[in-house]
Curated annotation (Swiss-Prot):
It holds the Pfam family Ribosomal_S7. PANTHER family: RIBOSOMAL PROTEIN S7. One of its GO terms (biological process) is translation. Keywords: Ribonucleoprotein, Ribosomal protein, RNA-binding, rRNA-binding, tRNA-binding. It comes from Lactobacillus helveticus (strain DPC 4571). The gene is rpsG. GO terms for molecular function: rRNA binding; structural constituent of ribosome; tRNA binding. This is Small ribosomal subunit protein uS7. One of its GO terms (cellular component) is small ribosomal subunit. Belongs to the universal ribosomal protein uS7 family. PROSITE patterns: RIBOSOMAL_S7. Disulfide bonds: none annotated. One of the primary rRNA binding proteins, it binds directly to 16S rRNA where it nucleates assembly of the head domain of the 30S subunit. Is located at the subunit interface close to the decoding center, probably blocks exit of the E-site tRNA. Part of the 30S ribosomal subunit. Contacts proteins S9 and S11.
């Protein structure tokens, strides 16, 4: 934590191929050890696979998948009177997209397809159809928030 004040976030530049900031953020989440070109080629190959399999515009399928993966509620731990409570809170928009991208990439990495572009493409297609592991994760988070609804009055 810096002592000299608030550090401003740098603006993410739009992706040159699809002209979308969300695609750039996905490339950043895919990137390992700063290898942006590798991450970009994986993503563009995945988008080509999505277009071949669905016959739709890959950016539209990806945005639909993101809407199905992004959480609305989550729980945060708060200590009250010596015991920890899981308090449901609404997720800020920036965190929603970050969590959605993180879950999409992490569950794509756990899939069993041969290459990463196939894994990512199939996870995006599954998420756009409201199936897949990333959507299941969102449902689990929402279920947890719903189960702890009784503690919502504690506010964070």
């Amino acid at each position: 934590m810096p002592r000299k004040g608030h550090v401003t976030k740098r603006a993410v530049l739009a992706d040159p191929v699809y002209n979308s900031k969300l695609v750039t953020k996905l490339i950043n989440h895919l990137m390992i050890d700063g290898k942006r070109a590798k991450a970009s080629s994986i993503l563009y190959d995945a988008f080509n696979i999505v277009q071949d399999k669905t016959g739709k515009e890959p950016l539209d399928v990806f945005e639909e998948a993101m809407n199905n993966v992004m959480p609305v509620l989550e729980v945060r731990a708060r200590r009250i009177g010596g015991s920890n409570y899981q308090i449901p809170v609404e997720v800020r928009p920036e965190r929603r997209t970050t969590l959605g991208l993180r879950w999409l990439v992490s569950y794509a990495r756990l899939r069993n397809e041969h290459t990463m572009d196939e894994r990512l493409a199939n996870e995006i297609i599954d998420a756009s159809n409201n199936t897949g592991s990333a959507v299941k994760k969102r449902e689990d988070v929402h279920r947890m928030a719903e189960a702890n609804r009784a503690f919502a009055h504690y506010r964070f």
